[in-house]
Amino acid sequence: ALSILKGLEKLAKMGIALTNCKATKKC
């Protein structure tokens, strides 16, 4: 179960990074 949580956390961080990237247009 822990590995799944860590995977979700990683995906969430990537999603946030992508959102920031698009918002600031610093891709």
UniProtKB/Swiss-Prot annotation:
Report one GO cellular component.
extracellular region
Predominant location: secreted
What is the top-level taxon of the source organism? Answer: Eukaryota
Question: Do the record's keywords include Secreted?
Answer: yes
Keyword match Magnesium: no
The record's listing under InterPro entries reads: Antimicrobial_frog_2
Q: List the disulfide bonds.
A: C21-C27
Q: Which keywords fit this entry according to its UniProt record?
A: Amphibian defense peptide, Antibiotic, Antimicrobial, Disulfide bond, Secreted
One GO biological process term is: defense response to Gram-negative bacterium
The entry's note on the tissues where this protein occurs is:
Expressed by the skin glands.
Pfam families in the cross-refs: Antimicrobial_2
Which cell locations does it reside in? Answer: Secreted
Describe the family membership recorded for this protein in Swiss-Prot or TrEMBL: Belongs to the frog skin active peptide (FSAP) family. Brevinin subfamily.
Role: Antimicrobial activity against Gram-negative bacterium E.coli.
Protein name as annotated = Palustrin-1d
This chain's source organism reads Lithobates palustris
